[in-house]
């Protein structure tokens, strides 16, 4: 029995070393095209390795679309993009059945797949579409299949959605409800690049030749990596840190002083997301097990879209990141 366990552990170690090298190569390849967004790249890779979806928040012109295109090439995924608008219908995303007539004169319905049938889908400005259209995509994200005219159609594997939102323009938008926000593993802030990164952007993107992304992985290799993430061991101290942090982010006794600022907090799905994400981050760094530092670093992007502040907190000028930072001091 002990020998079989040892063989299993050796197999995980060898697989982890191989997968970690592939992921680091992919990360470097993406970084050679997307400048000054290292944290965004890492968190996006963590989301994908965890098998989840991400919501990218940033003003226009910060390479969000370029990031998705580059991820598709680097990870060997079929990538597509949907520009969400108020008149976009669910059938524009999912697909529809059309009536075809054969050469013999026979008529039959044929399903034409929509752009949701991709391995990596960019939902650009998702909050501009109607709630009905948003729900169609978010249901597909959760269930990994769609149903049209009573027929089930499975989505390709892997299937990941990277949705974007512009934090400045709120007129004519439909904010995502809390239940739908919870389906995104992370909310990732895309900030302006620093001065050195912007200087590099000027030189490398305005010349005669443009740097193109190179493939580093395949879809099958990514699926293997995602399965490996779920097999990585997690220490009891890390599990307790996850439980303490997520439970303290809810109103109640466990939140302590911060409880008076929290109107509602994350459910068990946040704990699941954090458990997967810390494993994925450890694998990217070449480690076989996550640490409490991983929990603290990933707490904000995983928790902040799953929380709301009380009127008192907003009146005092507090923000959700402020509250999460306060909660983290009780863990680390």
Regions picked out by a protein language model, each given a short descriptive name:
Residues 43-46, 100-122:
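Conserved alpha-helical scaffold flanking the Walker A/P-loop in AAA+ ATPase domains
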Residues 15-59:
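Pre-Walker A (pre-P-loop) alpha-helix and adjacent loop at the N terminus of AAA/AAA+ ATPase modules
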Residues 48-86:
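Walker A/P-loop
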Residues 12-20, 33, 173, 187-258, ...:
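Conserved C-terminal "switch" segment of AAA+ ATPases
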Residues 100-104, 129, 133, 141-232, ...:
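Canonical AAA+ ATPase core
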Residues 124-125, 136:
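Walker B catalytic acidic pair
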Residues 1-13, 17, 253-332:
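C-terminal engagement/docking regions of AAA+ P-loop ATPases
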Residues 59, 93, 164:
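P-loop (Walker A) phosphate-binding loop of NTP-binding proteins
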């Amino acid at each position: 029995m002990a020998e079989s366990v040892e063989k299993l552990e050796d197999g995980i170690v060898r697989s982890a070393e191989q997968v970690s090298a592939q992921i680091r190569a992919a990360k470097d390849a993406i970084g050679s095209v997307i400048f000054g967004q290292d944290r965004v790249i890492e968190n996006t890779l963590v989301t994908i390795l965890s098998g989840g979806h991400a919501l990218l928040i940033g003003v226009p012109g910060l390479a969000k679309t370029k990031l998705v295109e580059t991820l598709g090439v680097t990870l060997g995924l079929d990538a597509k993009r949907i520009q969400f608008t108020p008149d976009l219908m669910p059938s524009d995303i999912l697909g529809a059945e059309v009536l075809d007539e054969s050469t013999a004169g026979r008529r039959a319905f044929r399903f034409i797949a929509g752009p949701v049938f991709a391995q990596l889908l960019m939902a650009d400005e998702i909050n501009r579409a109607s709630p009905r259209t948003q729900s169609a995509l978010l249901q597909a994200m959760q269930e990994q299949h769609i149903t049209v005219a009573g027929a089930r159609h499975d989505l390709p594997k892997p299937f990941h959605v990277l949705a974007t939102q512009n934090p400045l323009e709120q007129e004519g938008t439909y904010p995502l409800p809390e239940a739908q926000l919870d389906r995104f593993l992370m909310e990732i802030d895309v900030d302006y690049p620093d001065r050195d990164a912007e200087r590099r952007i000027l030189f490398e993107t305005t010349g005669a030749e443009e740097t193109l992304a190179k493939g580093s992985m395949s879809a099958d290799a990514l699926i293997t990596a995602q399965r490996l993430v779920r097999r990585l061991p997690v220490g009891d101290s890390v599990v307790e840190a996850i439980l303490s942090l997520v439970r303290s982010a809810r109103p109640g006794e466990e939140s302590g002083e911060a409880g008076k600022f929290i109107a509602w907090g994350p459910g068990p799905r946040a704990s699941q997301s954090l458990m997967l994400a810390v494993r994925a981050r450890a694998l990217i760094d070449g480690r076989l097990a996550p640490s409490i530092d991983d929990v603290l670093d990933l707490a904000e992007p995983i928790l902040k879209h799953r929380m709301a502040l009380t009127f008192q907190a907003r009146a005092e000028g507090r923000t959700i990141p402020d509250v999460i930072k306060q909660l983290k001091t009780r863990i680390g």
